[in-house]
Amino acid sequence: CWELYWLEHGIQPDGMMPSDTTVGVGDDAFNTFFSETGAGKHVPRAVFVDLEPTVIDEVRTGAYRQLFHPEQLISGKEDAANNFARGHYTVGEEIVDLCLDRVRKLADNCTGL
């Protein structure tokens, strides 16, 4: 999904936009999904969370891995095996505070939430 967003907005895998690209400039929808770093990279406004680590590891090793800050990629050590109680009370409970903290940090950086 994110790869499609980058392609639609002309963002390269290193997060940079070619200088001749005007897609997204001044566009509120564009700024909803991406923020620009001090170095000019366009990075997603997202936190990825999964109790099962292999899914998040695909993002960590994928073509666009440079665009995700490691703090935005949160994974557990094991999945909940499709068991709500296990995900809510045991395995998931271990990372819920970390997830809430990361989402709070992203929300703090928003100008109009």
Curated annotation (Swiss-Prot):
What is the main EC category here?
hydrolase
What would be one Pfam family of this protein? Answer: Tubulin
Q: Quick one: which residues bind GTP?
A: E52
Please tell me where this protein is predominantly located: cytoplasm
Q: Is the keyword Magnesium assigned to this protein?
A: yes
Annotated S-S bridges: none
Annotated EC: 3.6.5.-
Cofactor(s) required, per the database record: Mg(2+)
What are the recorded GO MF terms, alphabetically?
Answer: GTP binding; hydrolase activity; metal ion binding; structural constituent of cytoskeleton
Q: Does the keyword Cytoplasm apply?
A: yes
Outline what the protein does: Tubulin is the major constituent of microtubules, a cylinder consisting of laterally associated linear protofilaments composed of alpha- and beta-tubulin heterodimers. Microtubules grow by the addition of GTP-tubulin dimers to the microtubule end, where a stabilizing cap forms. Below the cap, tubulin dimers are in GDP-bound state, owing to GTPase activity of alpha-tubulin.
Report the sequence similarity comment from the record.
Belongs to the tubulin family.
Describe, as the record does, how this protein assembles with itself and its partners: Dimer of alpha and beta chains. A typical microtubule is a hollow water-filled tube with an outer diameter of 25 nm and an inner diameter of 15 nM. Alpha-beta heterodimers associate head-to-tail to form protofilaments running lengthwise along the microtubule wall with the beta-tubulin subunit facing the microtubule plus end conferring a structural polarity. Microtubules usually have 13 protofilaments but different protofilament numbers can be found in some organisms and specialized cells.
Protein name per UniProt: Tubulin alpha chain
Instruction: Give the encoding gene's name.
Output: TUBA
